[in-house]
Amino acid sequence: MTREKSGISRREFLRQGTAAGLGLAVSPSLAGLSWAATKDVVKILHGTGMDSLHPYNHSSGSLYGAWEHVIEPLAYMDYNRNEFVGRLAESWEFQGKKWVFHLRKGVKFSDGSPLTSKDVAFSMNFMKTDKRSLQKSPFKRVVEIQTPDDHTVVILTKKPRVTFLVNSIRNRFIMSKAAIEKNGTDFGKHPPIGTGPYKVVSFQRDGDWVIRRNEDYWGAKPQVKEYIWRKVGEEAARVAGLEAGQGDIINYIPVHEIPRLERHPRVRVEKVPGLRIYFFGLNPVFKPWDNKLVRQAANYSVDAHSIVKNIFDGNGFVLDGPVGPHVIGYDPNMKRYPYDPKKAKELLARAGYKNGLDVKLYFSPGHYAKDTEVCQVVAS
């Protein structure tokens, strides 16, 4: 398949707006379309709803992806290239305790006003100080934000921070300073004004969130004119809605439904790499996990590859460490413990548990896909 000529392809919208899913299903109305053609209006049945139009009053990965089409960051993480790419900033420099961002010229907000460095400084200070903001912590170490000219932003930090782009730039969206000063912060009445390829048309709490194409977008014009984001919490209801034509796209497909939907003649399933990680926390403060040998035995006793193959039908992959390849800090040289129950028993015996031991396994049933089945396998 070829990529759309528009600035944001349909696949990229799905990737950003439905992060961490096991898969996506596209309805009959979209399945036969090429990348050069699409519907004017696309309905997304999503497991997560938009409960507020406050752009900083959330910390959800999927909502970050949705908002990015209305209000944009200085830079974003391109997971295909595994590197940061400029969006509102065309370049930047790291100078110890100073970060200098050079804004892209000619960028306008959806109301026609130009983007300047003052909008960037205002938005970041708003994230840092607004009482409803859930994005304050990334700016705790920011000392000052300077705007020497309309297209330059200088951010001073207490100490050098190599993770600054990850924590304080990625997913930190820029709003219009003038619009906030004019309309106030009742975003339910006056939605945020951004520079993105779409603008907010309407919103219902935990209902429909409608965004429409910004015809004056500074970048390449996307081909889809309007997206309707509808919350459908139940997995089965999303699948039924897709097959009934009530939606064009669904996310978080139940694992057991993937093979059936893949065989469906009028549905296309797209699998995208997710960031959801299944792990078991072994607290080394409490017994028996304070013993390194017991922790090692636990790692040797779980056949992770079998879990992916038999429970998730191959829809996943086994990690060698605590983070995946798309996360800062990933070490490709780290190797996981192999499945070796004999080794696990030997380690337990050395730790003083020759006959094994009983431990409690806590989890929240239904919170993650197939979580009960995974825990049953681990417990056995």
What are these regions (language model features)?
Residues 1-12, 35:
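N-terminal secretory signal peptides
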Residues 78-83, 169-222, 226, 236, ...:
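Gly/Pro-rich hinge or "lid" segments in bacterial periplasmic/extracellular proteins
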Residues 93, 98, 137-179:
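Surface-exposed binding/hinge segments that line
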Residues 100, 214-260, 379:
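Ligand-site clamp/hinge motif
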Residues 48-64, 87-88, 113, 135, ...:
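A structural "hinge/loop" feature
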Residues 213, 290-380:
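Append "and occasionally in soluble cytosolic enzymes with long acidic Gly/Pro-rich linkers
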Residues 45-96, 125, 193-195:
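N-terminal lobe/hinge region of extracytoplasmic solute-binding protein
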Residues 90-133, 148, 154, 238-241, ...:
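Aromatic- and charge-enriched surface segment that lines or borders ligand/interaction sites
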